């Protein structure tokens, strides 16, 4: 290639990389591709990319040389060391103002570090969350870019051309914030995804083991739920899974081992919440539910040792299914309320000016948690951009309050039947705790002060003053120096 022709380049031709490259080219942007295993480049150029505006490079030097300036390079390689290694190989080949874009599932602290490093070399960096899986990459993903602000105007037209669209035609891509903001928001998205899936599984379990419903009956329930306030991608595919049979007519969902896998992004979200002191209880329970499912053999053994087994439901099944619908929706509100609390805390910690309504819009299409519900979140932040918690918005306050009785009936019935509802239950516990003007933490502080002299605050004194009681008469007045009010 004698003169640079490609608007953008992409490194990493696994399925996600191929699909994203095809998406970019289909929107009118000539693109160069490279892969460490060069045979993949040839196979792609001579296969899915044949006859299209692609340039397949066999070396990084050739790849970089094929790009128009400022060069824009998407890296779709395995998160972790591989990203750092690729950056080190690319930096010497680039010039001031060129842009590196990490489109993988990188941990946001790594993106913060990489942004600082790349900027120190006179280059620009973007860490962008990409949601929607392989199909989304091809047809339109949800994109959550963050990093060097100066890079956004250079890539905005490409990103907003290839991303998904809301039903109103708005692009599901907007600038999130500096350094690691984009990957942080994608991490929270993944955590919410964990919670949504676990809550759906809990309603399925209550219908399956509690009500004794067939997969066909549950398929019909989820079909109906997807027409209303629960309309979402995950409800839609739950419906499809419950109705799916293999070539022998067997219901596939019943053949799948009940031991869940995970890639770690849910854990990252929970750890981030702990670091910021945020009560991300529902998503934490979703992560631990997967951990518990993974000890399959232990559970099977315990089921033979610990009685009684799950009881059968007696009562009005149709009414209970309606209660489940209400409990799922109310719990979903709590899950998003917690996720947004975490993003607000991170915004303060890392000095990100996050657009919370804009984030809801970005999630409205193309991504795994896309749902009609997100439109209501966007409206909530339009009403009040400084909204502290979704539970305080008039729409969501009414939505939860009107479902409280049904929500509580579901939790009680689950406990009576012996069917675990960790996420639905933790959502209700958070709701009750958040609306309590007094919690038993006063006793907790007294106990901490008793055994560790950690001190406490008093209700009759200004906040921030520390007090210690010599509870036994033998402890003296020395207090813990590690306590932070």
List the predicted regions and their residue ranges:
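Interdomain hinge/lid region at the active-site interface
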Residues: 183, 208-213, 220, 228-298, ...
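C-terminal amphipathic alpha-helical interaction region
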Residues: 401, 406-485
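Glycine/threonine-rich flexible loop motifs
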Residues: 72-89, 104
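NAD(P)+-binding Rossmann beta1-loop-alpha1 motif at the extreme N-terminus of oxidoreductases
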Residues: 1-71, 94-97, 133-137
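Small-residue-rich helix-loop
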Residues: 224, 348-380
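Rossmann-fold dinucleotide-binding core
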Residues: 8, 83-86, 101, 107-220, ...
């Amino acid at each position: 290639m004698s003169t640079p022709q490609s608007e953008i380049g992409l490194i990493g031709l696994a399925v996600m990389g191929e699909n994203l490259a095809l998406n970019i080219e289909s929107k009118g942007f000539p693109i160069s591709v490279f892969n460490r295993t060069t045979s993949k480049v040839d196979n792609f150029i001579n296969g899915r990319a044949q006859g299209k505006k692609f340039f397949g490079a066999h070396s990084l030097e050739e790849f970089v040389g094929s790009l128009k300036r400022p060069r824009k390079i998407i890296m779709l390689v395995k998160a972790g060391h591989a990203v750092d290694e690729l950056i080190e190989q690319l930096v010497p080949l680039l010039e001031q103002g060129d842009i590196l874009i990490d489109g993988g599932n990188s941990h946001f602290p790594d993106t913060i570090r990489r942004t600082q490093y790349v900027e120190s070399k006179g280059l620009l960096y973007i860490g962008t969350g990409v949601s929607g899986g392989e199909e989304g990459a091809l047809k339109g993903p949800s994109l959550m870019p963050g990093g060097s602000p100066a890079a956004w105007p250079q890539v905005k037209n490409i990103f907003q051309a290839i991303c998904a669209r809301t039903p109103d035609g708005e692009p599901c891509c907007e600038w999130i914030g500096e350094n690691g903001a984009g990957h942080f928001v994608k991490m929270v998205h993944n955590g919410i995804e964990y919670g949504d899936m676990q809550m759906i599984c809990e309603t399925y379990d209550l219908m399956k083991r509690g009500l004794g419903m067939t997969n066909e009956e549950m398929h019909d329930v989820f079909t109906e739920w997807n027409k209303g306030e629960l309309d979402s991608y995950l409800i839609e595919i739950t419906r499809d899974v419950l109705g799916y049979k293999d070539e022998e007519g067997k219901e596939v969902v019943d053949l799948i081992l009940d031991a869940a896998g995970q890639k770690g992004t849910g854990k990252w979200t929970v750890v981030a919440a702990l670091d910021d002191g945020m009560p991300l209880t529902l998503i934490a329970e979703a992560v631990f539910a997967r951990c518990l499912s993974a000890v399959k053999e232990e559970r099977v053994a315990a089921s033979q040792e610990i009685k009684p087994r799950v009881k059968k439901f007696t009562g009005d099944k149709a009414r209970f299914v309606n209660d489940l619908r209400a409990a799922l929706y109310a719990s979903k509100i709590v899950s998003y309320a917690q996720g947004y609390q975490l993003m607000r805390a991170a915004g303060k910690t890392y000095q990100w000016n996050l657009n919370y309504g804009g984030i809801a819009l970005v999630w409205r299409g193309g991504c795994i948690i896309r749902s009609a519900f997100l439109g209501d979140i966007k409206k909530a932040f339009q009403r009040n951009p400084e909204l502290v918690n979704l539970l305080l918005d008039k729409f969501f306050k009414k939505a939860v309050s009107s479902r409280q009785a049904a929500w509580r009936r579901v939790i009680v019935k689950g406990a009576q039947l012996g069917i675990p509802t960790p996420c639905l239950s933790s959502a209700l516990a958070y709701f009750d705790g958040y609306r309590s003007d007094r919690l038993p933490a006063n006793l907790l502080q007294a106990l901490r002060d008793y055994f560790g002299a950690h001190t406490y605050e008093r209700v009759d004194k200004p906040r921030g003053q520390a007090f210690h009681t010599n509870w036994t008469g033998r402890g003296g007045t020395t207090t813990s120096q590690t306590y932070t009010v």
